[in-house]
């Protein structure tokens, strides 16, 4: 509710509100309750850190489930398909800023298009300080 109040004061209007939580901070079902109470409409936490792809087996949203009440939340899960650090980072797939990395992102994006799903991409803000990474991000978004 506080987020929406501040956004209203700033003139920010949008129909969807979502977020992503670092996996080390995630706690089921407490985190889901928090998002629900905050009025979020979707969560994009679920992904693999070490491999880009379909951790949830889908690129379509689905309702978050409350295991304590055996019911669905209003909150939707929007699976995170790719994170820049996973694909280009040395600690994970290690493709760097190469044509192979761009190809991997574009393959995943096309796989989502093929089934009319959503390609959810996480690109951390510090990565925009590097011109090559900005160019790769732009190529992915424009594709």
What would you call each of these model-derived segments?
Residues 5-112:
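Active-site-adjacent pocket scaffolds in enzyme catalytic domains
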Residues 6-11, 99-143:
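C-terminal domain-boundary segment and adjacent tail
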């Amino acid at each position: 509710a506080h987020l929406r109040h501040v956004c209203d004061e700033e003139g920010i209007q949008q129909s969807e509100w979502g977020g992503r939580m670092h996996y080390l901070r995630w706690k089921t079902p407490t985190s889901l309750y928090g998002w629900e109470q905050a009025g979020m409409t979707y969560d994009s936490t679920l992904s693999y850190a070490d491999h880009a792809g379909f951790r949830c087996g889908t690129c379509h949203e689905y309702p978050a489930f409350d295991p304590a009440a055996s019911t669905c939340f209003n909150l939707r899960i929007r699976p995170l398909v790719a994170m820049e650090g996973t694909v280009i980072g040395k600690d994970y797939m290690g493709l760097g800023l190469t044509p192979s990395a761009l190809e991997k992102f574009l393959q995943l994006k096309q796989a989502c298009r093929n089934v009319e799903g959503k390609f959810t991409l996480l690109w951390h803000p510090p990565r925009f300080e590097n011109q090559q990474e900005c160019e790769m991000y732009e190529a992915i978004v424009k594709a």
